[in-house]
Amino acid sequence: MVKANENEYRLNFFLSRGYERKICRSCSTPFWTLDKSKENCSDVPCTDYYFFDIKIKSPPLTVRESREKFLRFFEKRGHTIVPPKPVVAKWRDDLYLTIASIVDFQPFVTSGLAKPPANPLVVSQPCIRLEDVDNVGITFGRHLTTFEMAAHHAFNYPDKQIYWKDETVAFAKEFFTEELGIPEDQLNFKESWWEGGGNAGPCFEVTVGGLELATLVFMQYEIRGQDYVPLKLKIVDTGYGVERIAWFTQRTPTAFHAIYGNLVSSFYKKIGVGEVNNELLKAAAIYAGRIDPDIKETITAHREHLAKQLGLDLKYVNEELTRAARVFQVLDHTKTIALMLADGLVPSNSGEGYLGRLLIRRALRVLRLLGSDVKLHELIKDQIDYWKEDFPQMLKNKDYIVDAVINEEEKYNDTISKIPSILSTLSKKSKVDLDELINIYDSNGISPDLILDEARKRNININVEIPHNFYSIVAKKHQNALVRENRKDKIPKEVIDEINNKKIEPTVPLYYKDQYLRTFNAKVLLNYKNFLVLDQTTFYPEGGGQIGDTGIIRSIEGNKQAKVIDTQKYKGVIVHILDKDSPFIQGEQVYGEIDWQRRYRIMKHHTVTHVILSATRRVLGEHAWQAGAEKTEYKGRLDVTHYKLPTEEEIRKIEDFANYIINDRRKVRPLYIERTEAEMKYGVSIYAGGIPEGSEIRLIEIENWDIEGCGGTHLINTGEIGGVKIVNVEKLQDGVIRLEYVAGDMVSNYARQQDEKLNEISKLLNSPVSQINVRLKKHLEEYENLQNLLDKYRKIVLDRIQEIAERISVNGITIYILRDFIDEQLIKEVMRKITSNNQNIVISIRGKDTKNVEIATSKDIKVDKIVDELRKIGGRGGGKGTYGSVSITVEEEKIIDTIRSAITNGV
């Protein structure tokens, strides 16, 4: 929908070259063309695809050739080629995946905070969009989950203009006519409007023969509520479809044939289904623009039209095109999965990992629908081999990609086993709505169509309507990251109000000038109860996983003093939290001293965290990205993304790497560097520990080992750490593992604790520490022998239990009474055996003063009433179905009489 004034689109370029502004007779959208007879905008659905018939001078171009032609064209015209960023948007805290080339420069470059890497520039950025995942294949190439957006960008500042609309449109005309040889009268510039990321502007969609080949956006407004405010920085934001250019020049039956070449036939064979006739596919593709996947009837109409035109049976057409669409989906999804994982995504139940798992499971589901037993990871290997020159990170991370997908395949199979229990729950409901379906998918990873398949097999009726775009709905719901709010809990609102009302200037952080500075003098700027703000300080405020400093602050005269028990920060203002109301007055000079021993230990744990993170990435793979961290006086904690628990050997390697770097006494230094320069020089891995703000960022460099953004305090040499010991590794959540470690003198402290535990075990085993393993092994062997012997005795008792157990009969029901049986396993086995036959109850009574009563009944007897009667005489507990447990302080005979009475009165 065009929102801009017509003058926004009335360019000198069009007027000088004789273009006419026309209105599409189908969609009523204005467009510019040299063809005076043209009546529509040459975009689907206003027309069918007819680009197959347009004569062009360009030879058929592969995806790689299309990309190179575009990049070199703009390089020759003064644009600097910049490398693409990963498809996992690690430099953004509000977005998981790279959905467009402009994302590379948001938010810092587009806001004017940071400089672009070049101006103007050109890039071919791989992108991933999952909001149309259900449409892939159905439209024969119009929808893809992964595509390359070839783009040239120009950033126009008030004092430095690069180029704007006329030049951008001229570049498009020149590229399409001279590089691809498209007749100029076939080009159409369709007026449109773009909005995204809080910005907006007019744009042109460049269409040829029904195919949109490019979009030319002119980002010139900021959206503020209902208003569009002109931006000082005006940005040329273009996007050319590399895959569409390849399809346009190759004129293959579908876009998938142009993108994947011989992989198409290979996938048909490996999946084990017949290849669909190319003539049928080409005919289907020509009319594919008529398909609106959100309207099921358009798919039906498309296939009916095709069957009629080609004189084919409709059932045959449906079967062939459905099979082709599914194979195309597998082709598309496997490439996207390989790209995601190659760029560091770890499949999980949250964040970007959720989107990765969603696509993996959708691919597995499609393979099931195709009746294929091929392994998904085998197909992904083929994608890696096919794209390894275009995306070398795929080959570099091949082992991780394949292993992670195998792991996901195993989890998916485990998930399938949960379907019957979920089906049982849903069958009892009158209707199952979309929210519940999404909740089931989020919680269990089970898609609704799998549930329906199982329901049909079992002849179970479930009242549910599954939207055709279920995966798209779920992906859209999870595509944006949840922006975490900065916690201000430790600074009360009253203090924040005081800071804002008095316009307190940011505190000078002396700890950056000298990280070893212990004492300082400062002036009091603000007092509020036990909260104190100074003009400068060496107290480090909590942030980046490093806890806040403690220490003392006293008056220069020494007659007033308070302990600092914590340090926090609000918008650059450092707040000292005291152990009592501040004794100081505003404007007073004070003396501060941090608890140096505590800070020094924290610095060791912070620096070693950087060492360990880099070691972890070297051992586990580059996908191991920091997901959280904490550095305290006593230990460090690092959470990293990884798909399974590391082996003991991997943990040893990480620890050995870290201690090698410590013993090698590597220099550690802070660097202050312009953000864009840092990204170009070191890559987005500088954001492994978080995304710092500002145009200039602070990096911590460990010589020839690690470099990442960090605002914490560090040692100047790794040798000062002394040593590190990993003390615990555990799975924190799906896709995230936690490492805990101690450094410096905390290593000896940990060793002392371990010695104490060993000595305690030594006493218990009555063995010297050096012989613990031998003695323990012997005890375990004896224990195993005793267990075997006990199992034999249990079997003897179990075989004769109905003969030897005390029992009474009430109303035809036999009650077996087990008094003071201490073997819990035997009790359970007795209960299971006896209650397998109807009209039986087993009661186990244990304990002296307080009796623990367990009741098991056969299926024909409900335990509830028995439990209710025991509650009436003071029992506490509950029961359901055929088992109950009650704690009670009455005599055994009273318990038995109560149960007898309950049965007499009918259970």
From Swiss-Prot:
Principal cellular location given in the protein's record: cytoplasm
SMART domains: tRNA_SAD
Pfam families: tRNA-synt_2c, tRNA_SAD
Keyword annotations of the record: Aminoacyl-tRNA synthetase, ATP-binding, Cytoplasm, Ligase, Metal-binding, Nucleotide-binding, Protein biosynthesis, RNA-binding, tRNA-binding, Zinc
GO MF annotation terms: alanine-tRNA ligase activity; aminoacyl-tRNA deacylase activity; ATP binding; tRNA binding; zinc ion binding
Protein's UniProt keywords contain RNA-binding: yes
Top EC group: ligase
CC terms in the record's Gene Ontology section: cytoplasm
EC identifiers of the protein: 6.1.1.7
Cell location: Cytoplasm
Comment on bound cofactor: Binds 1 zinc ion per subunit.
Cofactor(s) the protein needs: Zn(2+)
Reaction it catalyzes: tRNA(Ala) + L-alanine + ATP = L-alanyl-tRNA(Ala) + AMP + diphosphate
UniProt domain comment: Consists of three domains; the N-terminal catalytic domain, the editing domain and the C-terminal C-Ala domain. The editing domain removes incorrectly charged amino acids, while the C-Ala domain, along with tRNA(Ala), serves as a bridge to cooperatively bring together the editing and aminoacylation centers thus stimulating deacylation of misacylated tRNAs.
Protein name, UniProt field: Alanine--tRNA ligase
Naturally occurring in which organism (per UniProt): Sulfolobus acidocaldarius (strain ATCC 33909 / DSM 639 / JCM 8929 / NBRC 15157 / NCIMB 11770)
